[in-house]
Amino acid sequence: MIGVGVDVVEIERFRLALTRTPSMRERLFTPVELDYVAPKVDPVPSLAARFAAREAIMKALGLGLGAFGFHEAWVEVEPSGAPRLVVTGRARELAVDRGVVRWHVSLSHDGPVAVAMVVAE
């Protein structure tokens, strides 16, 4: 195992940030992610979990926020409903440099928080 990263996002605080800066959605999330959450009655908890996943990836790699662009790592959903990380560009280069060959991700949101756990191996 290379590393583990966990991140927690306060959903209402994240909602306020998205409301205050509407362009943030497109800056932080890929079209794939935005399409996935579009039919949800309240997409913000799912978006918060996906944001947490990006930060958890950076932590799993031992890096700080801003180590790579937000569109260089994102969450897709398998036909089974399981989340799957897609890591490209600078994020992929950093992962390869550290010997990462496989990713695992778990997302959840309940009540006031969204959480993501990422394992890089």
Model feature map: region roles:
Residues 1-121:
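Core catalytic alpha/beta fold that binds nucleotide/phospho-ligands
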